């Protein structure tokens, strides 16, 4: 059995798991999974996320507003993300008010997934205002923040430098140099299947440069299954391939990678 595996970033509430969600989750502990942080991205999926967190003692939750949730439905297209916030029509302030009561739930350990995504046609001013508000909320609640950063390094880093929240930079895709100064602020760095893809040289350099004590493992499941199963539906058991890759890059045993990253996850989530 591989492990201990702590998946710091999962989306088991996604429709891709509708057919076998509970059977799959029931099977994970036997595969070495000791923890999962299930991520909400808006008020619509938060009840489903919390249902999972309360059903399984080893599942915790992060509650926030993903930047894609500000997309208008007509901007999504067949190949784009699903329009996730329709309840409030992209009104992020109303969305935050709707989420506020959930942060009192003891299973909610972080604010997120939130951040900036400049790949999709979401107005930057709205994204920046929302992300800043969520950082301030995380500081107020004394909870870590789960940072989404896609094609937005400079603006994400500027806000992280200004406010210096604790938390995880999800699916880290920046340079090794940037990772090192972010690490000095106490941030952790999530690596998942994407770091195993051919050509992921920046990820390899960042992994090599960072101390193992500031790395955490993640899937972003059902997305980003690692090599050699890329293109399939991902789940937390497949983190074993990510752990093996990181062990190879850092020249340590896979057992040490799993042990230390699970310890890191518990530390950042204050478990």
Language model segments and positions:
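Mid-domain alpha/beta scaffold segments of enzyme catalytic cores
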Residues: 1-271
């Amino acid at each position: 059995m591989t492990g201990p595996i702590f998946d710091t970033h999962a989306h088991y509430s996604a429709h891709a798991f509708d057919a076998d969600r509970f059977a799959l989750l029931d099977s994970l502990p036997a595969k070495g999974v000791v923890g999962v942080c299930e991520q909400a991205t808006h008020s619509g999926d938060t009840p489903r996320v919390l249902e999972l967190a309360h059903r399984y003692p080893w599942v915790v939750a992060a509650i926030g507003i993903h930047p894609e949730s500000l997309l208008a439905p007509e901007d999504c297209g067949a190949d784009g993300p699903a329009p996730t916030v329709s309840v409030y029509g992209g009104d992020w302030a109303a969305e935050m008010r709707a989420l506020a009561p959930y942060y009192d739930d003891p299973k909610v350990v972080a604010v997120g997934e939130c951040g900036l995504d400049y790949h999709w046609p979401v107005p930057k001013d709205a994204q920046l205002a929302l992300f800043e508000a969520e950082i301030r909320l995380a500081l107020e609640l004394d909870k870590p923040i789960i940072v989404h950063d896609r094609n937005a390094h400079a603006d994400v880093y500027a806000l992280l430098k200004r406010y210096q929240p604790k938390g995880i930079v999800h699916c880290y895709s920046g340079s090794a140099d940037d990772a090192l100064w972010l690490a000095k602020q106490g941030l952790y760095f999530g690596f998942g299947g994407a770091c195993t893809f051919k050509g992921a040289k920046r990820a390899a350099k960042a992994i090599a440069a960072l101390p193992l004590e500031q790395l955490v493992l993640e899937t972003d499941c059902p997305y980003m299954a690692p090599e050699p199963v890329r293109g399939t539906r991902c789940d937390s058991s497949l983190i074993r391939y990510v752990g093996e890759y990181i062990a190879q890059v850092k020249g340590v045993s896979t057992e040490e990678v799993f042990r230390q990253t699970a310890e890191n996850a518990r530390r950042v989530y204050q478990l």
